[in-house]
UniProtKB/Swiss-Prot annotation:
This is Dynamin-3. It is an enzyme of class 3 (hydrolase). Pfam families: Dynamin_M, Dynamin_N, GED, PH. Residues 235-238 are annotated as: G5 motif.
Length: 869
């Protein structure tokens, strides 16, 4: 390859790519595309070939490039080419690449000059290129030939615009030196899509083919028709050179010789030629790379900060240290104990806001689930009265009793107390499950050491199972203690006298636990507050709507909002029951309903009041609160109602009074027992289970771990953890290295600032006014006689320059003395113009040029507007 400037950029980009590859990421460094735009046979393909440094594009007269060629350069160790339409086939001979381009063009467009917008995609892999995209476009033409359509100009224009409108596309506006620059379609198109001129570089070709005695010095010096980034002159190989197999390297030497030997260009030879064009383009690539570095730097610094804390822990990791495993084991067990205690006892720091902790769930078991299970088992009033009746009758036997037998009371009470074993044991099971779940969550931090995690779970779970048996034995013992002696002398027990008084009441409301006879004087104590949705209100009446509900021992009220200022309704709890409602597949809400046992409307004209919650846990919690207020669940009774009604109907008034008396006594005594059990069971579980497990973890877990397995086995890291640690450390180093490389690139490269804007309005003017002739915009060489101006065809050629650095643009030809030059508002920094002197002939060519002097600054003065129109 012949692009030395590109080869200097390759190491920088490769270092950046390598740094990102070490991170396992792709470096999204999208370098600009380079598109060549110009008329037919302007030398576009030759410019592109010279930039790449390879001969691979078709050549000839007329329209040769008839389809866009999208050339992707890919950095690779091997050098070959691939076509998208020939997948899998590698071209190592670039003459074959040229033939394939011609064949593929003819396949789509035909053999008779047809064109197509379907691009040919070619990839060239080489160690001497950057990852760039170059685009060779068809030449701009106006008259169709051969098979070309009538709107050939429009089609080619649209084809070109598809590529050059992209912001990351550098535009090489190619114009031959032997044509009129003011009519350059390439410059006009570039101006449309790049009005600021930041992406456009003018390229003047065929300087060696200009008419004898003319040159393009004023154009190349950016004086005549200025562009923001100026012009670069190049000399491409002729068809004769190509046929003679003249390579690009030899062509560049000939080009260099041309500019150094030509009298009009030798003073700007260092800014002319293909090498300088390569330098300009590669400088734009360098600018682009430097512009992308801040984003890369910010991205890498963010990643570095995110892993820095974790890497700090790994930095002190010394696998060869024999004390490391002992220290790590001790720290792990201590951390596990702290985490377990925080999850059970609660903690103010690092509070989980997404789910309840183990301690919070156990609290719900103690104060919501356990009371709910107790109340659920004793709500069957009809069954209880039947049992009391049977007990009284069986105690009396064949005799007719005159008094209420206290043995019937004891028998019924003992049977009811024994029923408490089920809810009590169930609460133990629920607490055990939560403890095990808490242990599993705490051992997640031990996952880096699989054997340690497994052994910790096993040892703690075994201890919990051991305590399970002792806790359940103690719970059963508490129940048996209550059964063993019925204390009718308890201060809260109503006694027979009060029971008989209460039996005279027709309507009695059953109470729950300690909400029975020992209620406070005010029954307006709030049991629960919260948001609920009344879901069974029809759409015509407003539809489902959320309200703020307040539950007391006497009523259920709801308000518009939680400020409790606007009360919507108050529902008394008398004769109310609660039941579940099947969840609708159309709704995500969980619903329960309240209804009246006497078939009365609960709310307005509704028999049921359906209330919706967001979760089943909320439903269970509200049902437990309603139970505390005396609202029982509805449960279909499977007894034979007819027999029960017959027996009730057959009871004599005395037996009925005795049943009612014992029922009141049982209710009073069971409220005492329930209060006691609800208080003692949580305390028993807390003492024998939860506190014991905490003490075991703090005092004995470490010793059992040491005795269970070898320490080295316990502290053996998982393969995943070792890999993660290595990856973290590697990524940390790679990030630091990448940041260093970015810093090196920023230091080693220099951004070239964009040139100041110029007045390029001549591109628009050229559409409205007649353009100057090609001959008048080319100046004569210093050895040629002064050309005669053509009247009415624009400005005359400029006078010869007295020195290499004092050239002036053309001067208007006017007889007689000239008036002083008016000051122009155009400010594009052109050198001053030299007035003509009619009193004497123009100076001849000096035989010796004065050497360029740095002490002679060039005075810059605006051009006359008349020279541009």
């Amino acid at each position: 390859m012949g692009n030395r400037e590109m080869e200097e950029l390759i190491p920088l980009v490769n270092r950046l790519q390598d740094a990102f590859s070490a991170l396992g990421q792709s470096c999204l460094l999208e370098l600009p595309q380079i598109a060549v735009v110009g008329g037919q046979s302007a030398g576009k393909s030759s410019v592109l070939e010279n930039f790449v440094g390879r001969d691979f594009l078709p050549r000839g007269s007329g329209i040769v490039t008839r389809r866009p060629l999208v050339l992707q350069l890919v950095t690779s160790k091997a050098e070959y080419a691939e076509f998208l339409h020939c997948k899998g086939k590698k071209f190592t001979d670039f003459d074959e690449v040229r033939l394939e381009i011609e064949a593929e063009t003819d396949r789509v467009t035909g053999m008779n000059k047809g064109i197509s917008s379907i691009p040919i995609n070619l990839r060239v892999y080489s160690p001497h290129v950057l990852n760039l995209t170059l685009i060779d476009l068809p030449g701009i033409t106006k008259v169709p030939v051969g098979d070309q359509p009538p709107d050939i100009e429009y089609q080619i224009r649209e084809m070109i615009m598809q590529f050059i409108t992209r912001e990351n596309c550098l535009i090489l506006a190619v114009t031959p030196a032997n044509t009129d620059l003011a009519n350059s379609d390439a410059l006009k198109l570039a101006k449309e899509v790049d009005p600021q001129g930041l992406r456009t570089i003018g390229v003047i070709t065929k300087l060696d083919l200009m008419d004898e005695g003319t040159d393009a010095r004023d154009v190349l010096e950016n004086k005549l028709l200025p562009l923001r980034r100026g012009y670069v002159g190049v000399v491409n190989r002729s068809q004769k050179d190509i046929d003679g197999k003249k390579d690009i390297k030899a062509a560049m030497l000939a080009e260099r010789k041309f500019f150094l030997s030509h009298p009009a260009y030798r003073h700007i030879a260092d800014r002319m030629g293909t090498p300088h064009l390569q330098k300009v383009l590669n400088q734009q690539l360098t600018n682009h790379i430097r512009d992308t570095l801040p984003n890369f730097r910010n991205k890498l610094q963010g990643q570095l900060l995110s892993i820095e804390h974790e890497v700090e822990a790994y930095k002190n990791f010394k696998p060869e240290d024999p004390t490391r495993k002992t220290k790590a084991l001790l720290q792990m067990v201590q951390q596990f104990a702290v985490d377990f205690e925080k999850r059970i006892e609660g903690s103010g720091d690092q509070v989980d806001t997404l789910e309840l902790s183990g301690g919070a769930k156990i609290n719900r078991i103690f104060h919501e689930r356990f009371p709910f299970e107790i109340v659920k088992m004793e709500f069957n009033e009809k069954e209880l009265r039947r049992e009391i009746s049977y007990a009284i009758k069986n105690i009396h036997g064949i005799r007719t009793g005159l008094f209420t037998p206290d043995m019937a009371f004891e028998a019924i009470v003992k049977k009811q107390i024994v029923k408490l074993k089920g809810p009590s044991l169930k609460s133990v099971d629920l607490v055990i499950q939560e403890l095990i779940n808490t242990v599993k969550k705490c051992t997640k931090k031990l996952a880096n050491f699989p054997r340690l995690c497994e052994e910790t779970e096993r040892i703690v779970a075994n201890h919990i199972r051991e305590r399970e048996g002792k806790t359940k034995d103690q719970v059963l013992l508490l129940i048996d203690i209550q059964v063993s002696y019925i204390n009718t002398n308890h201060e809260d027990f109503i006694g027979f006298a009060n029971a008989q008084q209460r039996s005279s009441q027709v309507h009695k409301k059953t109470t729950v636990g300690n909400q029975g006879t020992n209620l406070p004087p005010s029954r307006q104590i709030v049991i629960r507050k919260g948001w609920l949705t009344i879901s069974n209100i029809g759409i015509m009446k407003g539809g489902s709507k959320g309200y703020w509900f307040v539950l007391t021992a006497e009523s259920l009220s709801w308000y518009k909002d939680d400020e409790e200022k606007e009360k919507k309704y108050m529902l008394p709890l008398d004769n109310l029951k609660v039941r579940d409602v099947e969840k609708s597949f159309m709704s995500s809400k969980h619903i329960f309903a309240l209804f009246n046992t006497e078939q009365r409307n609960v709310y307005k004209d509704y028999r049921f009041l359906e209330l919706a919650c967001d979760s089943q846990e909320d439903v269970d919690s509200w049902k437990a609160s309603l139970l505390r207020a005396g609202v029982y669940p509805d449960k279909s009774v499977a007894e034979n109602d007819e027999n029960g009604q017959a027996e009730n109907f057959s009871m004599d008034p005395q037996l009925e009074r005795q049943v009612e008396t014992i029922r009141n006594l049982v209710d009073s005594y069971m409220s005492i027992i329930n209060k006691c059990i609800r208080d003692l069971i949580p305390k028993t579980i807390m003492h024998l289970m939860i506190n014991n497990v905490k003490d075991f973890i703090n005092s004995e877990l470490l010793a059992q771990l040491y005795s269970s397995e070898d320490q080295n086995t316990l502290m053996e890291e998982s393969a995943e953890q070792a890999q993660r640690r290595d990856e973290m450390l590697r990524m940390y180093q790679a990030l630091k290295e990448a940041l260093g490389i970015i810093g090196d690139i920023s230091t080693a490269t220099v951004s070239t600032p964009a040139p100041p804007p110029v007045d390029d309005s001549w591109i628009q003017h050229s559409r409205r006014s007649p353009p100057p002739s090609p001959t008048t915009q080319r100046r004569p060489t210093l050895s040629a006689p002064l050309a005669r101006p053509t009247s009415g065809r624009g400005p005359a050629p400029a006078i010869p320059s007295p020195g290499p650095h004092s050239g002036a643009p053309p001067v208007p030809f006017r007889p007689g003395p000239l008036p002083p030059f008016p000051s122009s508002s155009d400010s594009f920094g052109a050198p001053p113009q030299v007035p003509s002197r009619p009193t004497r002939a123009p100076p001849s060519v000096p035989s010796r040029r004065p050497p360029p002097s740095p002490t002679r600054p060039t005075i810059i003065r605006p051009l006359e507007s008349s020279l541009l129109d």
